[in-house]
C-alpha cells in the first residue's frame, strides 16, 4: 500500500493527498521540521504563488529521514539534520537539543502518527505547527474493490498507518497474507488490529521490497 505506483510491483493506491497553502509570516522562524516528503511537495505548491515565502528555502531544515532530506535538497532547501533512525519518537529526541533557543516551524499532516508535537511542547521548544496536507481515503466502488483485492498468499507492504487503515477499510486481511510494515508506528497499528508484520532494520521502501522478495523466495 503506497501513494505512488512502483514498477514492476502491484501498487494499491487507496489514499489521495490534499495540499493546503501555507499562510503565515516566515520571518520569525530559524528552523523547519519535515517528517514527510508530502509536506515538502505541499510547500513547493505554495511557493509557486507566494514568492515572499521562498525565504523558507534558506532556513535550516530538520528532516525525519533520508528520502525526505533528499526531496528537500533536490528543491534547494537547506538541510541541517537528518534523523538516524527515521522513526518519529526517536527523531524528536534527536532534534530537541538542536532546537533549543530556536523558533521552529513544523510543517505537518492533518493527522500524525507520532506525538512529536506534544513532546516538543513538553520540552519547552518554541514552535508553531502548520497543517499543509491531508491524507484522505479514496472512494472505491464495489467493482473497483473487487478488481483491486489482493490475491491469496500475497505479500503486502504497508508504508504508513493511513495506508493500513485504508486497506482494512476496504478489505479483509486473509490468514495467508503476509504483512511488511515501514516503521514502528505502522507495525504497532497492525498489531493492534491482530495482524503481525515483518519490519526491516532500515525504514525504507527499498528495504521492504528486498524483504518481500526474500520471503517469496523462501516460499518457493
Where are these regions (language model features)?
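Signature of uroporphyrinogen-III synthase
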Residues: 1-220
Amino acid at each position: 500500500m503506497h501513494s505512488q505506483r512502483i514498477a514492476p510491483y502491484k501498487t494499491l493506491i487507496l489514499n489521495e493527498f490534499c495540499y493546503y497553502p501555507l499562510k503565515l509570516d516566515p520571518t520569525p522562524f530559524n528552523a523547519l521540521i519535515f517528517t514527510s516528503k508530502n509536506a515538502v511537495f505541499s510547500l513547493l505548491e505554495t511557493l509557486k504563488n507566494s514568492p515572499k515565502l521562498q525565504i523558507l528555502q534558506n532556513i535550516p531544515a530538520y528532516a525525519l529521514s533520508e528520502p525526505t532530506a533528499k526531496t528537500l535538497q533536490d528543491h534547494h532547501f537547506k538541510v541541517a539534520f537528518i534523523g538516524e533512525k527515521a522513526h518519529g519518537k526517536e527523531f524528536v529526541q534527536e532534534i530537541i537539543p538542536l532546537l533549543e533557543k530556536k523558533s521552529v516551524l513544523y510543517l505537518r499532516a492533518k493527522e500524525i502518527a507520532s506525538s512529536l508535537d506534544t513532546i516538543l511542547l513538553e520540552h519547552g521548544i518554541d514552535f508553531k505547527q502548520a497543517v499543509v496536507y491531508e491524507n484522505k481515503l479514496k472512494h472505491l466502488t464495489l467493482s473497483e474493490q473487487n478488481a483491486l483485492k489482493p490475491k491469496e498468499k500475497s505479500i503486502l507492504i504497508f508504508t504508513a498507518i493511513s495506508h493500513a487503515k485504508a486497506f482494512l477499510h476496504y478489505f479483509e486481511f486473509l490468514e495467508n497474507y503476509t504483512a511488511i510494515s515501514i516503521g514502528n508506528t505502522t507495525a504497532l497499528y497492525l498489531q493492534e488490529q491482530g495482524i503481525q508484520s515483518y519490519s526491516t532494520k532500515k525504514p525504507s521502501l527499498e528495504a521492504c521490497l528486498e524483504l518481500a522478495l526474500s520471503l517469496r523466495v523462501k516460499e518457493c
